[in-house]
Every structure is written in C-alpha cells, then in structure tokens.
Amino acid sequence: IDEIDKSDDEFEAFLLEILSDYQVSIPEIGTIKGQIKPIVFLTSNNTREIGDALKRRCLHLYIPFPDPFLEEKIISSRVPEIDKNLKIQLVNFVQGLRNLDLKKLPSVSETIDWARSLVLLNVKTLEPTLVRETLNILLKFQTDIDVSDPEIDNLIEQSKK
C-alpha cells in the first residue's frame, strides 16, 4: 500500500483488522477470512504521523536517498540515452540540492524525470538559465525554488567537480 500516510483514520482501522486478524469485515457481506496470511508492504513519505497500533504491526525500514554512485546507476538504467557527463553533473547537482533546507527534497523519481527532460532538450551540460527554467521538475514547492535560486550557480560549479 503506497503512501499510507496519505490515508485517513478509517482506512488505518481497516488495515488493523487485516494485519491483526487476517480478515475483513464488510457490513453488507460479513467477515471474509484470508486463506493465507498476507504479506503487506506499506510505504510512507512521513507527511503525517501513523497511528501507534498500526506501527506495532509493522517492521520499519528506512531507505535513505542513494549515494551518487548508486543514483548514477539508477539514472543510467532509466535514462540510458543520457550523456555520461550530464548524468554525473545532474546527480551531483541533485545531491547538492538535498543538502539545502527544503520543504521536500527531490526524490529519485524526480531526478529521473529531470534527466529525461534534459535529454529531450538536447542538453549536454547544466547552465544556470536552463536549471532555473527546469527546476520545477525537481522541486514541487515555490518556497523550495526560492530557497534554491541563490545557490544554483554554486551548485552547478560544485556539480562539475
């Protein structure tokens, strides 16, 4: 179940029954009991606190952002046509963005989207004007774009190293 933190309390209560008793009660139909114990994966972006009862029934696994080497491999596999130097620069730039005080750090999927966009634009290297014109692909809040703007030149320079 993707992004459980975006669900409401009623859905959490529904999940508790599934995870505790391996059954679902539907007023119009009755109780349906599972033949086998389900294996359920929940993902969360931490946009709200999940109830303690649900947390007790789950194992927690935190997956951090990938290091630059792994992120380059991910970009290569998802955007194989990207220029090698652009890929390195793009990954270093995004890694630098993630060090800023942003409301929402750019995810790997947003990095992939940005890489695809830059390939479609036939970009070979990051330039300040281009980055400013496409930053909304990476950053989803105007406040984050505003925070990033004064750092763009420095981030581009650092990404070339």
Ranges and model annotations:
Residues 1-161:
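C-terminal regulatory/interaction module of P-loop NTP-utilizing enzymes
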